[in-house]
Amino acid sequence: MAVNNEVNNAASETPTDVSSSSQKLATEETALTNGADHEEEDGGEAGGEVFQLTVVLPREPHKIQIIVSSQEAIHDVRQSIIELPGTFQYSCFHLEHKGERINDFVQISEVPGLTADSEIHLVEDPYTEKEARIHIIRVRELIGAAGDRTDTLNGIISGASLLDSVTSKESSQNGTSTAPSHPMVGFDFQGSGNLSTLLPRAQEPGPKTVKSISVSPWNPPPYHLRQKGHLLYLQVTTNEGEQFQITSHVSGFYVNKSSTGKFDPSPKSAPKAHSAHSLLALLSDLSPSFEESFKGLQEYNNAKEPLATFQITNATPSNPWIVPSATAPLVAHQADITRTQENYLIAGIENSETLRDWNEEFQSTRELPKDTVQDRVFRERLTSKLFADYNDAAARGAILVARGEIAPLNPTEGKDAQIFVYNNVFFSFGADGVGTFASEGGDEAARAAVGKDVMGVRMVNQLDIDGLFTPGTVVVDYLGKRIVGQSIVPGIFKQRDPGENQIDYGAVDGKDIVASDEKFVSVFEKLSKALKVKKHAVWDKDAKRHDLEGSIETKGLLGTDGRKYVLDLYRVTPLDITWMEEVGTALDSPKEADAASESAYPHRMTVIRPELVEAYWKVKMREWVNGELERKRQAQKAVEPAAEGKEIEAATEASEPAKSEEPTENGELAKKSESDEAAEPSKPDQERIDIGDFKFALNPDAFSGQQPQTDEEKTEFAEDEQQVRLVCEFLRKTVLPELVKDLKEGDVGFPMDGQSLSRLLHKRGINLRYLGQVATLADGKRLESLRILAVQEMVSRAFKHVAGNYLRYLPIPLTSSCIAHLLNCLLGTDLNAAPKPDVDEAIAALYPEADLKFKEVTPESLKQEIEGQVLRRFRYTLDSTWTAGIKHLQLLREVSLKLGIQLEMKPYHFTKQSQTESAAAPPATNGEATKEAAPTGKSTNGKKKKKNAREASPAAVVSANAASPVTFNPDDILNTVPVIKEASPRSSLAEEALEAGRISLLQDQKKLGQELLLESLSLHEQIYGILHPEVARVYNSLSMLYYQLDEKEAAMELARKAVIVSERTLGVDNAETLLNYLNLGLIAHASGETKLALTYIKHALDLWKVVYGPNHPDSITTINNAAVMLQHLKEYHDSRTWFEASLKICEEVYGKHSINAATLLFQLAQALALDQDSKSAVNRMRESYNIFLTELGAEDKNTKEAEKWLEQLTQNAVSIAKHAKDVQARRNRGIRVSPRVTLGQTQVQPQIGQTVEAAAGRDTPRGLDSRSIDELLKFIEGSDQSNQNKKRPGRSNPKRRGGAAATAGK
């Protein structure tokens, strides 16, 4: 395993000590080179002493100093040396101290006599073949000679970042004489999305250091020369055009006498003899221009944001759905002979180095000690890397299975029943190939089960129960096929003796036989307790009773390695009986006989979500606590009534896990950290309640066909079923209405696309099958956006299922034709009402057995199929005109992301009008962001600039001018990528430190809080690596916390990192990325870089147009913020325009007479005064006053404030306007917007579903907060003399949002 990790490290450009960079940026304290730990959150174990070491080198610069921690491993120090600019020519060496070799895997503290200012010596080692290959790969990457790697998994420009492009565009505009005064000039609020927003700008290539470097045709060395130490032969062509044949020898590298036609690998004689231990040094000797060009390449690379260039090793890179054309400079295919040799260089001749025993690695990692903090860091770090490696390998294998590249182990079985083994991963299809789910819904049930199994495995991995093991599990959706990849559990294929069960715990062969091996009771008991599963009875086919700790479907297997494995975790929660009875899939349901009908729900695997169980448990627990308090109160008459609040709080604190701001997808909340508990003030005994007496658990086998035998069993089972029914009713009667109410009142962050809507529903414990009910509940103007989004999500999911049916058994070369035709039938009917499929008949003839039924699809038949799927899956009837109301671009994005489609970036014409309008328009550029690439849907951005014709690629010219009769052609589908579901656990240690830091800040322990936050940052970076979604979320969370602490420089740096990492791992147009851009803009404005801030906000608004379209409810406050920033730049007239735009959206969403509109009218009136439009200012203030008077009454503070302003404006409008200008600078110190105006998602837009108060860093109740108007009045009157750089009050601070770094809405 270590061997493979070294190969991976060597092949990666990611420095291991990058974590220190963020520590240096986040604080002025001394940072640790390799991310050494700060004082730990439990106060028990320090991160180790930090000191400086001197490393003595064999060549210049002869000595370097590095900062290390006594707790670091020597291996980490070694890796740091490899990555430092002055020493990266070294890769094959060991370290010595006082002449003694130091073991790479011991900690620094374990090396005798190694203290501060000690000297260690770097000693070059003889190469092995493997070390030589690693060295060559590394040098190729360092000198820029490595082309793009062959990648069968990740798509075109995967892991791209746009931040450099966004920033450089603003810089380039500022450098011109005709530059606009600010980035918002000419912004079209109602314009359609511009696809070029999603692509990075084309960049000039870096300087070439050598023409080529590759493995020589003479490679590998013959036997007799291997005996003499020859390892590899290379061929190098320098920039001067000279070609050299180089021998890689155990002693280093030297130029040999071979030529293209003659083999003589002996060293050349003087004066042409050149040799060196490092290939980098040898190239410098051979090429006079190498040094200068290599220096230029380093400068070129240093000009880029480092995070945007590092290889992503611990996460799956994001795959954009819009990509440059195949001929664009960003993706142009280059000749590189070594690309075909890379597998050999990485894995050797036998290719055996990449074969890993995944199961053994998973389980041995789980068995690592976790007693100390250092143990936990090492264990979680290894776990994170292992899951990333496995997910990558399993996804690659799944694609090969889907493409038919791997032979099945059982070729005589039906296609869906075939199984495969590749790269030590076991693959099967997510279909009911052998009839296991025949009674549950067949293929549809099997497909749902494997998806839920991944979620169950992730939950168990997160719980980390000693002695219980799970196989590595990944589900891959690719071109309509669902493929499951699992690590091979020892003994799972073992033939059992007669009478011996294949499974040791749970159901065997359906549910006829039930195994209940006592060995599994203890571990399953822990699992069930954590998942709130009740121990219950089940009965086999002979009516024999078995008491199981978990669901009968959850199986235990004793592996031949002696470990206890838990399998089939798709039923860890009970069935949603209310839904099943409604749709007729419940057992004994009168509708069940019609289950095969077109309108019947497709399967019976409709379980409730773990988050719902968690939410219901909290409700019941609070009820129980209140009951216990009442009982105590009756028993202790001396207790004061005022203590009740404290008692409830104490009980809640004692009973609930730490309030991590976001339940995970599997519903498990982060554990409360020890610091958290330590920080709590001690409570009197009488105020505490032992919640150990509170019992709540659900029977997951309720309503699943169990047959109790005795009356007592029947009574208990009926009680279990009633408890499950209550949970289902809680979902419908409480959770769903509360969510809709929160969104209606603007109290939480509003979703902006299907992914964020799904995440919000899941976080609340709502299954996506309730999208139809969400759409039905979204009644009225205020919830129109939610209804449109829910309908769009149902349509896109229905299209995914329809397309999957056509794609599943289609040969790969015909899939582009199928996808293009289906997209034309869905989105291109306004341009062509009867599109014809474009199929290459010559290719189709090669597959006589292929099912080409997609050719028969028409827009009408597709519409009917989608309506049928929406009705079946969501119980929602689309109205007859739904196709007229779809948002073309947004729906295209949704279906592309769900199917993994990568489309060429070009103007897509959805209507005849748009095609006519853009017929004369110049073509889109290859990867540069320009207005011309706007897809032409129902609205277009009319402001177009002339293009330089030389920027356009030939392919783009043809596609733009060809006047195609259809919207999509097969050539537009450039690639399809897999959609991956995986089971990686999150780091509990890093989350504990983050939560402890946040709690310390809330308790005004600023120094301790900052130390813990830095500790959490260091842990996140160490455990996940720097490029990971969880790290992006902690960067964003910490940037907001530092922003509130007035640490603007640190906040800015962290916010930039949050943007880049989320772009590269979540997507350039992901909702979290968009929100990160908005936060970055706010922090940039607070740091005095208002023009740059407006650039970021403009980019976010451009993304919004693509993701949602114009007029998103959350954009009200974003536009309002931009208006205030424009005031800061003294652009009063433009600022007024932006306030008016914000008001217009607010009136559309909330109504003209809403309090939100009144507050915006109040601000607009001030903006009009600044713009010297006194008459309009008076009118707007009067409107504001009238609304406040009607809605809140004459005595309300807001009404009085508006009345006061109205009087002042009316009495002396000119004087007020002048006065307002005088205090404008003070006013712009902070962006102050009423919380009702911000709708719960503004300067600190919540991570979809976060409350306004939590986001703004305050704990006030919901409702209109008159302080914002009061404070604004003080600003305008000049009574607040704060300077611009003073810290913002907590209430106007941005929301903390994002994944593990946001406070979830209750």
UniProtKB/Swiss-Prot annotation:
Residues 1285-1298 have a biased composition (Basic residues). The keyword Cytoplasm applies. Residues 1-11 have a biased composition (Low complexity). Residues 336-580 form the Clu domain. Residues 656-689 have a biased composition (Basic and acidic residues). It is found in: Cytoplasm. May associate with the eukaryotic translation initiation factor 3 (eIF-3) complex. This is Clustered mitochondria protein homolog. The lineage of its organism: Eukaryota, Fungi, Dikarya, Ascomycota, Pezizomycotina. The gene is clu1.
